[in-house]
Every structure is written in structure tokens, then in C-alpha cells.
Amino acid sequence: MARGCLCCVKYMMFLFNLLFWLSGCGLLGVGIWLSVSQGSFATFSPSFPSLSAANLVITLGSVVMVTGFLGCLGAIKENKCLLLSFFIVLLIILLAELILLILFFVYTEKVSENAKQDLKDGLRLYNTDNNVGLRNAWNIIQAEWQCCGVTGLSDWHEALQEKSVPDRCCQEHYTECGRNTTNVFWSQGCYEKVEEWLNDNKHLLGTIAMCVLVLQLLGMAFSMTLYQQIHRAGKKYDA
């Protein structure tokens, strides 16, 4: 009976972590594809040049892959050391998420102001030759979200030191339209647009966050249950 319970928990954990590992492979693949095919779509932040969408997805995919591999191997080999390592990794990730969440809510205003200032500093690099990625990123965001600058089109005037804006700020887009001051430009800043999107989708984002939390807790529960089952089975065998 005990052996049957052990096998049941073992294969449940293996399947759980196999899906986890496959998800990591998928994320890593998407990250590599973004890095290779969309390399020109880089970061908005001059302070964190490596903080691009591709690098974030690659990092996330790698962490998920390694964690899933630990869980799969620990389950199939019934290895207590690997199972404990899997539990500790998930616990560290969970604690890091909670700490970051608490810090974010405590320092929301400061984080927001620093983010705005950093993005504004990045606007100054818009026309420089070695920042094609930043330029493409701003062009895509402004066209898709129908916004201009960080808090408004005046950000571009300050950054470019002239009364012009990128062409993607124009409501009717054509070449050099940003230099024609009689044109109608998008008046809303992109930062505000992103805040609106986050507010509109807060329930969906909250649901996703809860699902991630449940998956982490399930992984920790499976690993500790299997760890205890193996430990007890070992004691009975020794006796």
C-alpha cells in the first residue's frame, strides 16, 4: 500500500515537472527567437541595457527549465537530495517574488518616478547610431498604443532639443510629419497608456499571478510529500 502511494505521488510529480520543464523549453525557444530575429527591438532603459524582452524571456525560461529538470530527475530517481533542492529553489523563488511585490507596493511612487526619469533619459539616445533597438522600440510602442513620449510630446522637445517629435507621434503618419508643427500629435504619454492597460487588465493579471502561485505551492507540496514517502520507505527497509 505504501509503495503504491509512493508510486502515485512519484509519477504525479514527474508529470507535473515534465510540463514545467516543457514550458521552460518553450520560453527559452521564444527568447532565443526574439534575440535572433527581433534583435533590433531592444530596451527602453539606458541604465539597464541588458533588460530587453528577449533576455528576460531567456532568463525566465532557463530558470523554469532547470527547476523542472530538478523535479523530474528527483521524482524518477526517488532522490531525496534532488527533491530537497527542488523544494529550496521553489521556496527561494517564492520568497523573492513576495519581497519584490512588497517593495514595489511600499515604494510605488518612487519606483514610478525613477522609471519615468530613466525612460526620459533614454529618449536622448533616440537618434544616435548605436541605439537602433531603442528607436525601433519607441516607434512600435507609439504607433501601437497611440501615444507620444513618456508623459507627453514635450518629453521629445526636451530630449531632441528642438520642436519636433518622431513621426510615429503623428495621428496621420507620413515621412517627416513630426517636424510639421501644424500636425495633430498623440497627446497622451506612453507611461500613462501602460498604466491604463495594467488597470484595465488587473483582474486577468491577478488571476495569472494566482495560478503561478498555486503551481509553485503544488510543486513544493509534491516534492515534500514524495520526500517524506521515500524517507519513510527507507526507514522501513532498514528496519
Swiss-Prot record:
- Its family? Belongs to the tetraspanin (TM4SF) family.
Gene of this entry: tspan9
InterPro entries from the xrefs? Tetraspanin/Peripherin, Tetraspanin_animals, Tetraspanin_CS, Tetraspanin_EC2_sf
Q: Which residues are glycosylated?
A: N180
Q: Look up and give the organism this protein is from.
A: Danio rerio
Gene Ontology terms: cellular component: plasma membrane
This one is known as Tetraspanin-9
Asked if the record carries the keyword Transmembrane helix, the reply is yes
Q: Which positions, given as ranges, span the membrane? A: 14-34, 56-76, 86-106, 204-224
Segments in the Cytoplasmic topological domain:
1-13, 77-85, 225-239
Q: Where in the cell is it found?
A: Membrane
Source domain of life is Eukaryota
Residue intervals annotated with topology Extracellular? 35-55, 107-203
| Membrane topology classification | Multi-pass membrane protein
The alphabetized UniProt keywords are:
Glycoprotein, Membrane, Transmembrane, Transmembrane helix
Record carries keyword Transmembrane helix? yes
